[in-house]
Amino acid sequence: MVTPVCNSSTWQPKDSSFLSWPEMFSLDSFRKDRTQHRQRQCKLPPPRLPPMCVNPAPGGTITRASRDLLKEFPQPKNLLNSVIGRALGISHAKDKLVYVHTNGPKKKKVTLHIKWPKSVEVEGYGSKKIDAERQAAAAACQLFKGWGLLGPRNELFDAAKYRVLADRFGSPADSWWRPEPTMPPTSWRQLNPENIRPGGPAGLSRSLGREEEEDEEEELEEGTIDVTEFLSMTQQDSHNPLRDSRGGSFEMTDDDSAIRALTQFPLPKNLLAKVIQIATSSSTAKNLMQFHTVGTKTKLATLTLLWPCPMTFVAKGRRKAEAENKAAALACKKLKSLGLVDRNNEPLTHAMYNLASLRELGETQRRPCTIQVPEPILRKIEAFLSHYPVDSSWISPELRLQSDDILPLGKDSGPLSDPITGKPYMPLSEAEEVRLSQSLLELWRRRGPIWQEAPQLPVDPHRDTILSAIEQHPVVVISGDTGCGKTTRIPQLLLERYVTEGRGARCNVIITQPRRISAVSVAQRVSHELGPSLRRNVGFQVRLESKPPARGGALLFCTVGILLRKLQSNPSLEGVSHVIVDEVHERDVNTDFLLILLKGLQRLNPALRLVLMSATGDNERFSRYFGGCPVIKVPGFMYPVKEHYLEDILAKLGKHQYPHRHRHHESEDECALDLDLVTDLVLHIDARGEPGGILCFLPGWQEIKGVQQRLQEALGMHESKYLILPVHSNIPMMDQKAIFQQPPLGVRKIVLATNIAETSITVNDIVHVVDSGLHKEERYDLKTKVSCLETVWVSRANVIQRRGRAGRCQSGFAYHLFPRSRLEKMVPFQVPEILRTPLENLVLQAKIHMPEKTAVEFLSKAVDSPNIKAVDEAVILLQEIGVLDQREYLTTLGQRLAHISTDPRLAKAIVLAAIFRCLHPLLVVVSCLTRDPFSSSLQNRAEVDKVKALLSHDSGSDHLAFVRAVAGWEEVLRWQDRTSRENYLEENLLYAPSLRFIHGLIKQFSENIYEAFLVGKPSDCTLPSAQCNEYSEEEELVKGVLMAGLYPNLIQVRQGKVTRQGKFKPNSVTYRTKSGNILLHKSTINREATRLRSRWLTYFMAVKSNGSVFVRDSSQVHPLAVLLLTDGDVHIRDDGRRATISLSDSDLLRLEGDSRTVRLLREFRRALGRMVERSLRSELAALPLSVQQEHGQLLALLAELLRGPCGSFDMRKTADD
């Protein structure tokens, strides 16, 4: 066991049991500090404003019923901030909007000082500060609207128009944001010029543009940095004004000097108060700034200033105020000479006044964490290394071995796989082909022609044209309008042509669909139309579910991902006659990747025919991509659909103006869906609309659950008369199929779906379509290297597709929750996914299919080539995690990962878990990161977070909470007690369909691991007694292996931060990654943890939201796990007695110990690397018994090391900041 200690003292074990733990890293003081800071109120005297105050009513304030104002301006602070920010080209308007608070006996008063476009003040009242602020801000919004700074619907103008409007007030906008020179010491404005400007009482007024309550988390502020980063930005300024200050008495006999000082500092008392309050974090300066005035005709004022050190200033005047102002001005002059006031005569930031404390804390942060390994464990490590020495010439391979030495693994070296059946491929003999073709012809004759038994579709008259084009050309594009029948009919037409010509056995068609539900439902529809005799010739294959057709005369419907997997084991698609790529216009990343492979496949298999089918889109572009192939256009048929837009809908609902969110859309293009409006519309349709199903398109799962809950609450006891069906990729296929079922008589079907229901599937009884106009799109930020799943407007092509869902089988109605003007602004087609998402998976797939080409070369052949920089970033990441070598060839690790169908980092974690013998919990974690097991919604997030915290116990891990949740579910399933199962799900807020899906994923990953030669048989993966699960109960090892897979996704918790206002908060924490600071999302249990066992966290994914980067899942990891299990080299500094060891590629981990301990840990790390290398180079289960025993001893030592305490994070309890 080991004890890392992060201060000068070290922890000594009391006895051999090592059961005592050091003091945990406590966050209690941080929470208390934050609360106390918000409870204080700044009582500075209000700044003296020019006499340009607006007095529209007697009394000098703008008065109007707050209820009416807030109804017109529901988010007034955001609106004010947006107007000024846009007009001045700044991101924050704090120095243009100053809120001054006054406590009344019953209500709080706020005076809002507005400094742009001219100086004016308004007042607001409320029981809370935030209410008073909002009322004042709403009054200011009314004033802005009267000045013409807001449109009739409170919409914003562009920046150019604001500059013109500002000129009318005599305050050109440009003059307000031109950078101003400042003097050393470096101010926060210099450190973050885009966010902060000097001139305001830093930290005294709340951030504008936020409507939250007083307890809003301060960590959410943009621009917050940790102490180390702040000091590195100010290191060029060695001047510490507080150290240079000296006390003294200044008897002023020369009144001219005082007059000149007063001219330089016209409001000296205010300035002194602000400086002292900011520097000392106090709400008043009275105790540190005291006046004593004597005299009758001539007043003599003595100012005693106790900060930064005792100083006295004396001045005279005819009146008391004059004398005191002169003394204060002299004090201001002295402070400026000490560097305590900037060149604009404004206070410095709180951080700059506390540089000494910052530097002291920074020095503490830079000290390495001291580790002590108990002597018994050190002796065991020495004995192991003596018995199994690591060759001195052996260097950590970083899992990046040159591919020249790699043993071929997997199916690529074996027989081809039949793409239709999945069995080993063997061509049919001539006799078998004749016999099978004759049998198919007899079955077909009994059935009769398609058009005699199935309803006539618009595509049927074009039958000969389509079939002739496919016969004569290797590639054909079919552009068919919605409802033409291309998806179900063209595969049957191909099969009919081949069968009736006596060559049916040669017809083997693979039809790809973009989604699982489409592949299954279309296969079932075609199977039904072909009839009982030919039903076995139609099949489907999707993730976790497969029903392949019989060989010869086969139609296989599958997802694009399934076909990509088939191409790995049969690169030329031998045995396939046609590939039909349906819905190619959607331009998902897998389809674009598939087109690259299919284009190259034409040389390998010239007989293969490729058909691209699209409902909408730039079909000529596909034609040019395939060398000018023919495009056949097929008109569709739709019943009439009556369309309603937002303005029509609001009129029907009796609402006479846009909801605020929709007004905001018009000005800011932001996409926030009003779930209440959606619910009201569905209820209105139900009450007054035609009978029939309602299909509602929503952006994502949270919106689906939100609308579902609102409908259930509104329907109450009448819910039995409605069938409310959510449709989302999170829901297993067996549950999604319910949307195709006809509801009982008198029951209305309401389908709540994402764009999963937009194409390929037809729900016959849908009459009404509610279109939110929104969907989720993944976008990748090259600068932050973070993905963001954003809600964005759909394209016009999407709107057409959604509208078409209402007119497939009867006349219908489409309700668009956006104005007609928005439709005109929508882009014609979606941006291809390949241009806006991370490319690691795609690059890995490229290296599997065409290893001889570089990633850039391969992806440059796409219909739309991605940004070269994005491709290079993906290659670098894969090299960092050891999947590719420097020549872009797959490493041994990369070859193993190629078998596992998930994100490369998660796949790496699975591979390492098999080697480190803790496989099952990692399979659960990876499955749960793919599909969330909890039944979370907008309404119950807090409850879900509490359940996760309980499930995690004291592990400090969201990921182990997943493991315990699934383990509990598996245990309940064994009881076969329905009541127990339901109680378990309800108590732990788990979603049964997701748990079933997770179970399927674990089964699939088990097959993948078997294919990668990591286990002897798939069932071993979940068997507790199997060798691959020997250490599955060792939680620190499990978390460490997960971290090794996810590395460099590592966080170091650091003490102290500097806010964007320049406020130094020594008792707060920041979360530092290799690429910068991030925030912990409320959904991770470590966000609200009061004690952390370790300063180091690992995470899978960071997401960007509102300009900040958040981590949603995290696990505390042992510092020795970080040292021993990560890739890359380590760096050691050894003076012969003490040594430090750190990661060469990161400054997030530095450990210190005696030279012997550090040397042994380095050798132990190399032994672990050797174990991984050996395991990757051969079948894991086939390793010699002696090697397996060696690995077993090594892992036993590692588990013992990690059972020890993770170390304490000794926090200095400073005064409240």
From Swiss-Prot:
Annotated InterPro entries: DEAD-box_helicase_OB_fold (IPR011709), DEAD/DEAH_box_helicase_dom (IPR011545), DNA/RNA_helicase_DEAH_CS (IPR002464), DSRM_2 (IPR056755), Helicase-assoc_dom (IPR007502), Helicase_ATP-bd (IPR014001), Helicase_C-like (IPR001650), P-loop_NTPase (IPR027417)
Keywords: ATP-binding, Cytoplasm, Helicase, Hydrolase, Mitochondrion, Mitochondrion nucleoid, Nucleotide-binding, Phosphoprotein, Ribosome biogenesis, RNA-binding
Annotated Acidic residues bias: 211-223
Record PTM Phosphoserine, positions in chain: 29, 249, 403
Protein EC: 3.6.4.13
Helicase C-terminal domain mapped to chain residues: 677-850
GO biological process terms, semicolon-separated: central nervous system development; mitochondrial large ribosomal subunit assembly
Binding site for ATP: 480-487
Spans annotated as Disordered: 176-223
Chain location of the short sequence motif DEAH box per the record: 582-585
GO terms for cellular component: cytoplasm; cytosol; mitochondrial nucleoid; mitochondrion; ribonucleoprotein granule
Descriptive protein name: ATP-dependent RNA helicase DHX30
Organism: Mus musculus
Native organism taxonomy: Eukaryota, Metazoa, Chordata, Craniata, Vertebrata
